């Protein structure tokens, strides 16, 4: 979809995102390694996580990170594999992606995640106190560009209102 916004005669867009991935699982599954290997100096790398980064760390889907943007890590026994894994903060994973891109001479652009379709008192819920905040902090700590897509999207959706906004969100009734 984002490719529609660019002149494809001048640039190429490669969407390496995978539904349902957190920053941690994107790294663990080797998806970031493929991006990293393909990076060339001057490439723009848009980095956005946060929708799938909450929840269980070592049970069920086991894709969450430690909350926060610090350097903390903790070892967990993974229920699914029976193996131990070091898990870092959400911000640690973002900083890794950003610094890796910078190391290759690429230009990382970090985006806060789009808001969920959750409303209270006529306002869509913003994410400024957790993943949105940690995303901004990771960008600031590394000198990367930051786009507050959560705010930009929420502002536009609020102007449209709750009823018109529903069309932009997937119905999960039949899934």
Where are these regions (language model features)?
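A generic structural signal for well-ordered alpha-helical segments
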Residues: 6, 101, 135-139
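Loop/turn elements at helix/coil->beta-strand transitions in domains of secreted/extracellular proteins
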Residues: 9-12, 40-45, 103-109, 142-145
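Substrate-gating cap/lid alpha-helix
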Residues: 115-151
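Short, solvent-exposed loop/turn and secondary-structure capping segments
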Residues: 26-28, 56-63, 113, 121-123, ...
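Glycine-centered helix-coil hinge/cap
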Residues: 160-170
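Active-site segments of SGNH/GDSL-like serine hydrolases
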Residues: 95-129
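Conserved small/polar residues in nucleotide/adenosyl-binding loops
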Residues: 173-175
């Amino acid at each position: 979809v984002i490719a529609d916004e660019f002149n494809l005669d001048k640039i190429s867009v490669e969407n390496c995102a995978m539904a349902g991935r957190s920053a941690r699982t994107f790294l663990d599954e080797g998806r970031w390694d493929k991006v990293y290997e393909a990076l060339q100096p001057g490439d723009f790398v848009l980095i956005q996580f946060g929708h799938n980064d909450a929840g269980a760390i070592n049970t069920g889907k086991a894709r969450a990170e430690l909350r926060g943007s610090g350097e903390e890590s903790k070892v967990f026994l993974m229920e699914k594999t029976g193996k131990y894994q070091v898990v870092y903060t959400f911000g640690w994973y973002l900083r890794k992606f950003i610094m890796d891109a910078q190391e290759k001479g690429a230009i990382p652009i970090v985006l806060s995640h789009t808001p969920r379709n959750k409303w209270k008192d006529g306002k869509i819920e913003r994410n400024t106190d957790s993943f949105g905040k940690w995303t901004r902090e990771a960008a600031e700590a590394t000198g990367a560009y930051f786009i507050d897509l959560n705010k930009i999207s929420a502002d536009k959706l609020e102007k449209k209102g709750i009823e018109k906004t529903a069309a932009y969100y997937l119905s999960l009734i039949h899934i």
